[in-house]
Design a protein with these regions (language model features):
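C-terminal and inter-domain tail/linker signature
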Residues: 1-320
Length: 320
């Protein structure tokens, strides 16, 4: 771990420790210690570039959800100490909506929301981050439909205006695994995006899929239905695999992280269309991060982080 404090033995430990200190321990000022400045943080609906924006965003979230926890479900690692490591960190956050903020007046309701953060880490700091949080799960938990929340945010912001994120730091090269299981999975998702049959992927008969809004699918048919509905409504013009990593061993199933981006048109020509309302023809960008567990080449569990609220914001902008 060249350039990191001696206490950190590997990337997994580094991510767990700084998460515990900053967010679990409420040592918010430590963000300035463990994040570079500038540091680009991209979400499906926003791009920030300074460490102070990370600090202020964290404080705002805690004001709205003061009992928020960040419980690590998994960390899938790649990269090296020269070009930079990348941690793909899946978290589940139990929390209660107790304060005013971007989700409106406090409802007092309990929320469980999943997030995946892909962080480039170099010289003891997070230097670039891609983050997808399941905003639709928060909305539904507090009694708001994702479409309604999207409209509220559009009204407050004056419309959809996400800037283009800057490139990752010099010297960092996104990891694209050459392992056969990783390539097969990424290739299958890209094939789905272009109209292929999701049933062709080697899903286990009892696959467990968790998608946007915290929705759960069981089995091959329901899981394939999710992909058909998504890409049937948003017709893909281009699909890019941005990061692909496979971790094996440790007595566990193989674990895979895939970050992808699709440029689409909201056309809704499929019989499964309707997920985002009547077609508008509007260009819509999907920024997704998937985590997968595989055993003997079959997908046992699949987590798909896509921000439905950000997608609705793009669709509703067209209607406005």
């Amino acid at each position: 771990m060249k350039g990191f404090d001696p206490e950190f033995q590997d990337l997994d430990q580094y991510i767990r420790v700084i998460t515990a200190r900053i967010w679990e321990g409420r040592r918010i000022d430590d963000i300035r210690r463990y994040y570079s400045d500038p540091c680009t943080v991209e979400t499906p609906s926003s791009v920030s570039t300074t460490v102070e924006e990370v600090v202020s965003g964290t404080r705002a979230t805690l004001a709205t959800f003061p009992d928020r926890r960040l419980l690590a479900e998994d960390i899938i690692v790649s990269g090296d100490e020269d070009g930079g490591f990348l941690s793909s960190h899946r978290l589940i956050s139990p929390m209660t909506h107790l304060g005013d903020g971007e989700f409106g007046a406090p409802s007092g309701r309990k929320v469980h929301v999943r997030t995946i953060a892909d962080c480039v880490c170099k010289d003891n700091r997070v230097v670039h981050e891609w983050l997808v949080r399941d905003e639709a799960a928060i909305a539904r938990a507090i009694g708001i439909e994702p479409r309604a929340l999207a409209q509220t945010w559009l009204d407050q912001s004056g419309g959809w205006d996400k800037p283009v994120a800057g490139p990752a730091p010099s010297g960092y090269r996104s990891h694209i695994s050459s392992a056969a299981p990783a390539r097969a999975y990424a290739g299958a998702i890209e094939d789905f995006a272009h109209g292929g049959n999701p049933a062709a992927l080697a899903y286990d008969e009892a696959v467990h899929h968790i998608g946007p809004g915290g929705a759960t699918c069981y089995g091959r048919d329901e899981t394939a239905g999710f992909w058909r509905a998504l890409f049937g409504t948003l017709r893909v013009k281009s699909f890019t695999v941005e990061h692909l990593a496979l971790n094996s061993g440790g007595g566990r199933a193989d674990r895979l992280a895939l970050r992808w981006r699709a440029q689409t048109l909201h056309q809704g020509e499929s019989p499964d269309a309707g997920r985002y309302g009547p077609a508008t023809g509007r260009p819509v960008e999907i920024m997704g991060i998937n985590h997968v567990e595989l055993l003997h080449g079959k997908v046992l569990r699949e987590w798909v982080l896509v921000d439905d609220v950000a997608l609705w914001m793009q669709v509703l902008t067209a209607r406005a």
